[in-house]
């Protein structure tokens, strides 16, 4: 029999909202941790009195009752898990896990039973529904009716607002059944009633959220905040955590109360109550209870008369009444010696406190992030200056928190803290051109060499040079853009010949022509520069004929065992299947693993053998391809050399430039001299001669020499 049982997909109903978590059963007791709030239910094995197994909306549920009357319900179990749980209860808790079905007749009359903190509506011996009395916020009575109102949960999509019970009159004298019903409810209900005197009162305390000054009245079951505009009654059961945080100036203290559900002010919800105290402010406090009551209720944690700093008195009283530990900063110490880091979150500046189990930011808006919620953290270079950096936190739910404008000197301390807590660090520094190395960044000075800054300067110089080249009117080209075989040389000769040939008596026309030539030349140069860019190298695809790589021993075993794992765990997801397979593989003996290691070794040998055969065949084919390419190159060289023998390179370039000449360079001036006409005739005669030379086939000698090659 296993010493522990663990269930990951278990749900707990909290005021109409189903919260998932992990349930762990051990010899010592039962522990449930809420994944959303982090709240832990710890039930000692000796306190359990009864365990009930029943069918519920989410499969099957487990109901646990304790000696002090508390009831715990957990849903989401499979029917097949009953035997495993039943045996565990018998072995370790000496309890019989009973099966008990709910009544589904649909009747609306029955018997009401009060047991512990539950109101159970039964038909016969079967319960129809149960109401946790701790969820009741108000109980009112009518003539023959009792109305129950409930605390609301903001996370619940549908909430139960109220339930009305009709209580028929009885013949007994002196007993009012309606009043008796109401008293049974009120004795266990979480009804906030400011009856009696407060235990103590703190006057005019400064509250940051919700903002204002409030009188805080401490009652046995709730906290009453009384301000000029608003009043809040906060049950101690809604307090999740308490924090006592020193301000960076060492003269003030924050006292933070985490609430779930939050208090409301109109449409605004406050999940945190933040009080600000001065360290120099002292107070003498007297509790409104006699010494015996104080000793019996608080067991030495409080005394009737106390004195000290105001923040110490408030935190001490709250700790005793809420019965929760106060979280303080751990051993983290920043560059300035403070236990916090100055930063900005969203639009406001505040303080980030690295704690032993999480981070908390105060104060606007306050944020608390537990380590078990964090997926990874990231150190990013600040966008405006290198004197600061950003600290990013992404949770497992995908929520991202960015704390910006953190001083560079804090980097080393924060990095060491994150490393010590073993949080995943995912840097984006390489994407932003920043070297993510801790030592270089933490110890850098303003005068020290910054590789990122130097690279940005070099890129800026290159862009400026490119811009100057494109706007340069001299027409000079760099060595990189000079290619004799391309048609840019033809364009230059076309411009040169036209510049010397077109002589007009009108200076204005010549200036306009010159501007048009420059514009066309710029466009042509830019186009050629784009066309001469290096082609993008296409990644070679994998050869489909190549032999596949051999699988590892684990992968061979997983492929063979996948169906068996699915049959043993029906409905298991792919992620859970992989985790389960990893656990099984780790637990396997060496003898079983050796069998799969041998199979993996055989597969590796087969792969090496196939790879040698494949590479040998590929080498022969590559040699044939190279010989074919050489033949093609020779044929191309012969074709290129043939027309160059008929005319000079200059005449051929002139012929190409004339054939592509635009209208902008054709002189249409009526006052041009006769020299232009004679030059045009000469050009036409030269063009006709070049066409004849180009049309004549190569001589027999040329063809013979080409064949010899």
Curated annotation (Swiss-Prot):
Residue positions, PTM N-acetylalanine: 2
Looking up Pfam families in the UniProt record yields: HMG_box, PH1_SSRP1-like, POB3_N, Rttp106-like_middle, SSrecog, SSRP1_C
Q: Where is this site: Cleavage?
A: 450-451
- The modified positions for N6-acetyllysine read 233, 413, 542
Task: Name its cellular compartments.
Answer: Nucleus; Nucleus, Nucleolus; Chromosome
Q: Which GO terms describe its biological process?
A: DNA repair; DNA replication; nucleosome assembly; nucleosome disassembly; regulation of chromatin organization
Which positions does the record tag as DNA-binding? 547-615
Instruction: Tell me the residues on which Phosphotyrosine occurs.
Output: 441, 452
**Stretches for region Disordered:** 458-709
Q: Which family does the record claim for this protein?
A: Belongs to the SSRP1 family.
Q: How does it assemble?
A: Interacts with MYOG (via C-terminal region). Component of the FACT complex, a stable heterodimer of SSRP1 and SUPT16H. Also a component of a CK2-SPT16-SSRP1 complex which forms following UV irradiation, composed of SSRP1, SUPT16H, CSNK2A1, CSNK2A2 and CSNK2B. Binds to histone H3-H4 tetramers, but not to intact nucleosomes. Identified in a centromere complex containing histones H2A, H2B and H4, and at least CENPA, CENPB, CENPC, CENPT, CENPN, HJURP, SUPT16H, SSRP1 and RSF1. Interacts with isoform gamma of TP63. Interacts with FYTTD1/UIF. Interacts with SRF. Interacts with NEK9.
**Protein name as it appears in the record:** FACT complex subunit SSRP1
Q: List the source organism.
A: Homo sapiens (Human)
């Amino acid at each position: 029999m296993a010493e522990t049982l663990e269930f990951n997909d278990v749900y707990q109903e909290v005021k109409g909202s189903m919260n998932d978590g992990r349930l762990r059963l051990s010899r010592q007791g039962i522990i449930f941790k809420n994944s959303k709030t982090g709240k832990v239910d710890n039930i000692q094995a000796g306190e359990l009195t009864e365990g009930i197994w029943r069918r519920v909306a989410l499969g099957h549920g487990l109901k646990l009752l304790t000696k002090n009357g508390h009831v715990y319900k957990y849903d989401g179990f499979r029917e097949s898990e009953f035997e495993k749980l039943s045996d565990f209860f018998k072995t370790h808790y000496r309890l019989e896990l009973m099966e008990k079905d709910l009544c589904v007749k649909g009747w609306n009359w029955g018997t009401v039973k009060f047991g512990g903190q539950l109101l159970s509506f039964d038909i016969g011996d079967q319960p129809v529904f149960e109401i946790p009395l701790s969820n009741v916020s108000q109980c009112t009575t009518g003539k023959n009716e009792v109305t129950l109102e409930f605390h609301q949960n903001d996370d619940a999509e549908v909430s139960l607002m109220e339930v009305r019970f009709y209580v028929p009159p009885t013949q007994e004298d002196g007993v009012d059944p309606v009043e008796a019903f109401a008293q049974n409810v009120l004795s266990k209900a979480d009804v906030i009633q400011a009856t009696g005197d407060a235990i103590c009162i703190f006057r005019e305390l400064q509250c940051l959220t919700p903002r204002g000054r409030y009188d805080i009245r401490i009652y046995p079951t709730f906290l009453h905040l009384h301000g000029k505009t608003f009043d809040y009654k906060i049950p101690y059961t809604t307090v999740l955590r308490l924090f006592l945080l020193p301000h960076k100036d060492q003269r003030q203290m924050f006292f933070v109360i985490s609430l779930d559900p939050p208090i409301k002010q109109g449409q605004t919800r406050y999940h945190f109550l933040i009080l600000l105290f001065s360290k120099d402010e002292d107070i003498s406090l007297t509790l409104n209870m006699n010494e015996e009551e104080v000793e019996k209720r608080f067991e030495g944690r409080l005394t009737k008369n106390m004195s000290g700093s105001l923040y110490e008195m408030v935190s001490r009283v709250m700790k005793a009444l809420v019965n929760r530990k106060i979280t303080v900063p751990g051993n983290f110490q920043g560059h300035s010696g403070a236990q916090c880091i100055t930063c900005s979150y969203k639009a406001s500046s505040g303080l980030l406190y690295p704690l032993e189990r999480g981070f908390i930011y105060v104060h606007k808006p306050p944020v608390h992030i537990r380590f078990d919620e964090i997926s990874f953290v990231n150190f990013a270079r600040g966008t405006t200056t290198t004197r600061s950096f950003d600290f990013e936190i992404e949770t497992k739910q995908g929520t991202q928190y960015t704390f910006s404008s953190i001083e560079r000197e804090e980097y080393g301390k924060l990095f060491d803290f994150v490393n010590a807590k073993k949080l995943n660090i995912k840097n984006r520094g390489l994407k932003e051109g920043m070297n993510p190395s801790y030592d270089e960044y933490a110890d850098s000075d303003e005068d020290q060499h910054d590789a990122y800054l130097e690279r940005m300067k070099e890129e800026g110089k290159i862009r400026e040079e490119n811009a100057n080249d494109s706007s340069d009117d001299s027409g000079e080209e760099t060595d990189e853009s000079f290619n004799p075989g391309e048609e840019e040389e033809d364009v230059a000769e076309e411009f040169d010949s036209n510049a010397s040939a077109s002589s007009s008596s009108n200076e204005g026309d010549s200036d306009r022509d010159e501007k048009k030539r420059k514009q066309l030349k710029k466009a042509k140069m830019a186009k050629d520069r784009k066309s001469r860019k290096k082609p993008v190298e296409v990644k070679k695809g994998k050869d489909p004929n190549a032999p596949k790589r051999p699988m590892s021993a684990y992968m061979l075993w997983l492929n063979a065992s996948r169906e068996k794992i699915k049959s043993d765990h029906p409905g298991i997801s792919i992620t859970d299947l992989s985790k389960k397979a990893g656990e099984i593989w780790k637990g396997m003996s060496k003898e079983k693993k050796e069998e799969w290691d041998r199979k993996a070794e055989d597969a590796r040998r087969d792969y090496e053998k196939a790879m040698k055969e494949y590479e040998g065949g590929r080498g022969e084919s590559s040699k044939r391809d190279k010989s074919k390419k050489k033949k093609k190159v020779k044929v191309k060289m012969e074709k290129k050399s043939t027309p160059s023998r008929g005319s000079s390179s200059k005449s051929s370039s002139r012929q190409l430039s004339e054939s592509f000449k635009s209208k902008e360079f054709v002189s249409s001036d009526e006052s041009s001299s006769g020299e232009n006409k004679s030059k045009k005739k000469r050009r036409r005669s030269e063009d006709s001669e070049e066409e004849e030379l180009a049309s004549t086939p190569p001589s027999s000698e040329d063809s013979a020499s080409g064949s010899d090659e």
